[in-house]
């Protein structure tokens, strides 16, 4: 099985990969879902502060690859017969190293400017998003403290998401085809 890791700052367009996954019938496992699940398990409301604090605490308690371990266990238990599995939302170079140590992994980074991402997040209707600039900046700083910048800069592939949606999806699909050797 080959893992396809998706990384990018919040609002960059990572979730667009699910549309391609449906088209190519590839499973998507979201690392963010693991953190949101752990936040809910603690009885906390899903908002940027609680979800962010949960991610920090999980890494403090279980190490810097704390989110990758349960994700990979889940993938190995449920999807070991699949050719490809997408892991969406890789945040840490430690997670990348852990996954590469235990599986074949290619990482696709999706990049958008802070202004573009803020506009997208402000229009999204997810509880852990913010439409306040200061909260947005705090979230970015927290993400960067997880070493997401290293993951993005060391990714195997990069897709920029600043233009229109169709151009982005075409670029993403072309990159995706390279990763799964369809081209």
Swiss-Prot record:
TM regions (residue ranges): none
- Give yes or no: UniProt keyword Acyltransferase: no
Record-linked Pfam families: AAA_17
Q: Name one GO molecular function term.
A: ATP binding
Q: Is ATP-binding one of the keywords?
A: yes
The UniProt entry's sequence similarity note says: Belongs to the UPF0200 family.
Source organism of the structure: Methanococcus maripaludis (strain C6 / ATCC BAA-1332)
Query: Record's PANTHER family?
Result: DEPHOSPHO-COA KINASE, UPF0200 PROTEIN MJ1399
Q: Which SUPFAM superfamilies does the record match to this protein?
A: P-loop containing nucleoside triphosphate hydrolases
**Residues given in the record as ATP binding sites:** 8-15
Please report the name of this protein according to its UniProt entry. UPF0200 protein MmarC6_1392
Could you tell me the keywords of this UniProt record? ATP-binding, Nucleotide-binding
Report the superkingdom from the record: Archaea
Q: What lineage does UniProt assign to this protein's organism?
A: Archaea, Methanobacteriati, Methanobacteriota, Methanomada group, Methanococci
């Amino acid at each position: 099985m080959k893992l396809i890791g998706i990384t990018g700052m919040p609002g960059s367009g990572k979730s667009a990969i699910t549309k391609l996954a449906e088209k190519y019938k590839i499973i998507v496992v979201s690392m963010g879902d693991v953190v949101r699940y752990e936040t809910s398990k603690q009885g906390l409301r899903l908002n940027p502060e609680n979800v962010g604090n949960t991610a920090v605490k999980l890494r403090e308690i279980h190490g810097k690859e704390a989110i990758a371990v349960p994700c990979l266990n889940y993938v190995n238990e449920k999807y070991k017969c699949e050719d490809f599995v997408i892991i969406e939302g890789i945040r840490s170079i430690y997670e990348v190293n852990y996954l590469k140590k235990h599986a074949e992994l290619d990482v696709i980074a999706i990049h958008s400017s802070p202004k573009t991402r803020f506009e997208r997040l402000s229009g999204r209707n997810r509880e852990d998003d913010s439409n306040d600039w200061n909260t947005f900046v705090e979230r970015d700083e927290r993400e960067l403290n997880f070493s997401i910048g290293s993951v993005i800069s060391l990714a195997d592939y990069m897709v920029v998401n600043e233009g229109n949606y169709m151009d982005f999806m075409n670029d993403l699909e072309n990159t995706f085809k390279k990763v799964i050797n369809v081209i």
